[in-house]
């Protein structure tokens, strides 16, 4: 990869990881457009920029994490369903990384967002703080998160929808989605590291450093701006974007 490709992919990861539009789906499409082979170098790079996004969440929520055992329990509970499903079906999941499936997941996810928003009443969703989320709700959100194993679904999208259906307001559902990303992304990164341990070290170190820095700051900016956005607006634009993006993929990339 050249430096332009490194920066572009890092920006995409940083922006899309925490928006309900699937970072994996965007990285797959852009990598295909750049004709980048899925080899050891590419795998190491993707692990690096994903870890950068994890660090961005840790930095942004460092005060909430400190000495907050209850929050950690809820995050771990939400991880259990996707963790189990990932271990049981990871071989099948890797076979789903096709443009057709990504595009279909984009469209279906977009439709779900539009339906949920149509019937959503903010004033009736009385859970407005992370501390008020129950263990049962954490588990239900985790079950919704398991659907994100399907490429193109969006982990953040699945957890946000799950949170809204569990009586969380938009901002709280979004924040819990950010925090719930930590064990999922960390587990996915560790799984890739173990799987490709013999290939670690492949690639240009300077590319990895640049990718990490760009992804970290883009993720941090996205988290802050997205929370401000969702305090005033809804997820309808993201639903429409997902549908349009999925249709474009089917029209131009599926033969």
Curated annotation (Swiss-Prot):
Domain of life: Archaea
Membrane topology, from the record: Multi-pass membrane protein
Main localisation: membrane
Keyword tags: Cell membrane, Hydrolase, Membrane, Transmembrane, Transmembrane helix
Record GO terms (molecular function): undecaprenyl-diphosphatase activity
Pfam families, per the entry: BacA (PF02673)
EC code(s) of this entry: 3.6.1.27
Localisation: Cell membrane
Catalytic activity entry: di-trans,octa-cis-undecaprenyl diphosphate + H2O = di-trans,octa-cis-undecaprenyl phosphate + phosphate + H(+)
Transmembrane segment boundaries: 1-21, 75-95, 96-116, 174-194, 203-223, 234-254
Gene Ontology terms: cellular component: plasma membrane
General function of this protein: Catalyzes the dephosphorylation of undecaprenyl diphosphate (UPP).
Family: Belongs to the UppP family.
NCBIfam families: PRK00281.1-2, PRK00281.1-4, undec_PP_bacA
Designated name of the protein: Undecaprenyl-diphosphatase
Taxonomic placement: Archaea, Methanobacteriati, Methanobacteriota, Methanomada group, Methanococci
Gene coding for it: uppP
